[in-house]
């Protein structure tokens, strides 16, 4: 009887330890997601210039590469439900929207030279439903 009680208590203790480890991992993952999101959310409320936008585009491309996000035939990242990031740039002077890949692949240095002092504002921010990570930012040129 005593032996069975010890086995049951031991199993109960192991189960509690497993649940605690799972909760700790879940909390750490949530903290990491919040940290990653804050890197992009800080641009939501303020105006930035072209050089800052170029830096943000480079960061998004690096993140997509790190996460092994595949590209389509045009070289644009294919959005997934977990960790892809897209940045679109809406140019109001010519009424056209450019995906970040087009700017990045067509010489981002040239973009910086041409738009370094132009002001932009984040007009839309979207999140992945599955993970809560940022999925898309849309920046609009200010006049």
Model-derived regions, located:
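N-terminal positive-inside, membrane-proximal cytosolic segments immediately preceding the first
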Residues: 1-6
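Hydrophobic membrane-insertion alpha-helices, especially the h-region
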Residues: 8-22
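N-terminal export/assembly leader peptides and their processing motifs that target proteins to secretory
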Residues: 22-143
